[in-house]
Amino acid sequence: MRIVTAAVMASTLAVSSLSHAAEVGSGDNWHPGEELTQRSTQSHMFDGISLTEHQRQQMRDLMQQARHEQPPVNVSELETMHRLVTAENFDENAVRAQAEKMANEQIARQVEMAKVRNQMYRLLTPEQQAVLNEKHQQRMEQLRDVTQWQKSSSLKLLSSSNSRSQ
């Protein structure tokens, strides 16, 4: 259930980000989501990697192809979920079915993007791949630190709440 909820929230966040980006964006050649997709993939995955101009062009081509092949976010599914959430009578089974449907669509998009990232990774030299893998390990360590901090903060909060109530 947590996975379904997370996927639904991610989809909702993506759509709201895209709608905001569409309002802010200008220019005839701007495609909603293009900047967001490019920034999220390149700023995280390829930070600290020096790419040749040829590699950059190949990656741009892969991203452009992926954008055109990827199905858009299904706005009607989000509208359906909104109607279920705001309904007079809450129907858990209907919400669960809708959430699973939306989660499956999100999974399909993530798999497609993983394929593109794999193709981009294979464009790198062995040295660039080593740098990328090192950067990844550093990010994972940072995430572990944050997770550990969150756990310890939650435990402190719980223990201080228990001592006050006694």
Swiss-Prot record:
PTM remark: Degraded by DegP; some CpxP mutant proteins are more susceptible to the protease than others. Degradation probably occurs when CpxP is associated with some misfolded proteins; overexpression of PapE leads to DegP-mediated degradation of CpxP and PapE, which requires the N-terminus of PapE. Overexpression of NlpE does not induce this degradation however.
Q: Where does the signal peptide begin and end?
A: 1-21
Result of changing M59T? No longer inhibits Cpx pathway, protein more susceptible to DegP
Reported impact of D61 to E/V? No longer inhibits Cpx pathway
Q: Could you tell me the superkingdom of the organism this chain comes from?
A: Bacteria
Subunit architecture: Homodimer; it might alter shape slightly at pH 8.0 when Cpx is induced. Binds the periplasmic sensor domain of CpxA. Interaction with CpxA is not seen in vivo when cells are grown in 0.3 M NaCl, or if the misfolded P pili protein PapE is overexpressed.
- Report the NCBIfam families cross-referenced here: PRK10363.1 (NF007687)
Q: What is the effect of changing R56Q?
A: No longer interacts with CpxA
MF terms from GO for this chain are: identical protein binding; unfolded protein binding
Q: Which UniProt keywords apply?
A: Periplasm, Signal, Stress response
Q: What is this protein called?
A: Periplasmic protein CpxP
Compartments annotated for it: namely: Periplasm
Instruction: Please report the organism this UniProt entry assigns to the protein.
Output: Escherichia coli (strain K12)
Cited function? Acts as an auxiliary protein in the Cpx two-component envelope stress response system, helping modulate the Cpx response systems response to some inducers. Binds the periplasmic domain of sensor histidine kinase CpxA, inhibiting induction of the Cpx envelope stress response in the absence of inducer; overexpression decreases Cpx pathway activity. Some periplasmic stimulii (shown for P pili subunit PapE and probably 0.3 M NaCl) increase CpxP's susceptibility to DegP, leading to CpxP degradation, inducing the Cpx pathway. Aids in combating extracytoplasmic protein-mediated toxicity.
In terms of Gene3D superfamilies, this protein maps to: 1.20.120.1490
After gene disruption, what is the outcome? Answer: Hypersensitive to alkaline pH (greater than pH 8.8). Increased accumulation and toxicity of overexpressed, misfolded periplasmic proteins.
The consequence of Q55P is: No longer inhibits Cpx pathway, protein more susceptible to DegP
Q: Which cellular component terms (GO) are annotated to the entry?
A: outer membrane-bounded periplasmic space
Corresponding gene?
cpxP
Q: Which GO terms describe its biological process?
A: regulation of proteolysis; response to stress
Q: What induces it?
A: Induced by envelope stress such as overexpression of misfolded periplasmic proteins. Induced by alkaine pH (tested up to pH 8.4). Induction is decreased in a degP deletion. Transcription is stimulated by the Cpx two-component signal transduction pathway; sigma factor E (rpoE) is not involved. Transcription induced by spheroplasting, which removes the periplasm and thus this protein; if the protein is anchored to the outer surface of the inner membrane induction does not occur. Induced in persister cells.
Chain positions covered by the region annotation Not required for activation of CpxA or to induce degradation of misfolded P pili subunits: 151-166
Please tell me whether the keyword Membrane is annotated for this protein.
no
**Which parts of the sequence are annotated with region: Important for protein stability, probably interacts with CpxA?**
55-61
Q: Present the record's domain note.
A: A region in the N-terminus (residues 55-61) probably interacts with the periplasmic sensor domain of CpxA to inhibit its kinase activity and is also important for CpxP stability. The homodimer has an elongated cradle shape; a hydrophobic cleft on the convex face may interact with periplasmic protein PapE.
